[in-house]
Amino acid sequence: MMSTLFSNSISTSTKRRRQPRFQAVETHMFDPSIKAVLCDIGGVLYVGDTPIPGAIETLDRIKSRYSVRFVTNTTQKTAQQVVEALRSMGFDIAEDEVLTALDVTKLFLKNHDSRGFYLLTDDATAFFDDLNEIERQHYVVVGDAQENFTYERLNKAFRLLQSGSELIAVAKNRYFKDNDYQLSMDAGGFVSALEYASGKEAHIIGKPSHDFYRLACSSMNVEPAECLMIGDDIESDILGAQEAGLKTLLVKTGKFVVQDLESGIMPDFIADSIADIP
């Protein structure tokens, strides 16, 4: 049975882009068109290794009313590893409810019968080991490589691109909220550097890719217009979802900064945290 996802504690706004001011009004809203929810993970459900206050209980309520998928641009963890981490914090989440950019990247490579040169962490690179028998190496795959972002490896990636390989960005986020609760640089800057040097545009696998959002919606047998995206990233979560046809709710936790409200990207709804959803 459908139930309202919104109450007076959540502000709504008309979807307007490139406006000089963010304007929101308080309202009580019942939206019967919403049949499913996509929910970002880091910054929305938890920060560091601590759940957002009220997130566990709120998530249980949402899951009792809607089909839910948890979508994340993490380039360091598989769906199984994400679920293990969330369960250790007290969240009740199944592996088939999680869609990660890393898992979709592996599916992409398999479908294109290719392995990659990986600018990833050692653990993330090991996730692709079963593709090593594929002779064709047609892609440079870039995610958050941390200490593996060396000049030597970046230059090798550049030379492969110059030799004909294509560039894949597992994700292209600017920054993320780190375990010390400060913003840290994400993979996007390194992807942009390789794009600039090689003259090639990266194919983005994760959010804000339309294909990623459509894959998540189709896994619940709903159309994008019937789905709400909850996130803390004004570009990947909000703008990306809007352009894919979803409704959006921005939470002021995680990587959210006040300047996001001046970006001209207008979420359909805004809340202080996921706990404000009744």
Positions of predicted regions on the chain:
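Conserved phosphoryl-transfer catalytic core
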Residues: 66
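Conserved phosphate-coupling serine/threonine residues in phosphotransfer and NTP-handling enzymes
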Residues: 72
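Methionine residue identity
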Residues: 1-2
